[in-house]
UniProtKB/Swiss-Prot annotation:
The gene is rpsR. This is Small ribosomal subunit protein bS18. NCBIfam families: S18 (TIGR00165). GO terms for cellular component: cytosolic small ribosomal subunit. Pfam families: Ribosomal_S18. Part of the 30S ribosomal subunit. Forms a tight heterodimer with protein bS6. The keyword RNA-binding applies. Gene3D superfamilies: Ribosomal protein S18. The lineage of its organism: Bacteria, Bacillati, Actinomycetota, Actinomycetes, Acidothermales. It comes from the Bacteria. SUPFAM superfamilies: Ribosomal protein S18.
Length: 78
């Protein structure tokens, strides 16, 4: 009994490249919350589908937003 060949998962498209967004604003918390897990961690590139440049921009924007107290460092207590 041989297994059927596994399909490759569909490649995710970078949201910022698709919509033509050039600047990721740290004040746009609604957008940045999509890239944070329920524990407050920044989601990986393979999970979000961002390109390398926009993933770096998102990470920087999230860190700036945390410094300005717009986003929490953690969401859940132990």
């Amino acid at each position: 009994m041989t297994k059927a060949p596994a399909r490759k998962p569909k490649k995710k498209v970078c949201v910022f490249c698709k919509e033509g967004i050039t600047y990721v604003d740290y004040k746009d918390t609604n957008l940045l919350r999509k890239f944070i897990s329920d524990r407050g961690k920044i989601r990986a590139r393979r999970v979000t589908g961002n390109c390398a440049q926009h993933q770096r921009d998102v990470a920087t924007a999230i860190k700036n937003s945390r410094e300005m107290a717009l986003l929490p460092y953690t969401n859940a207590a132990r």
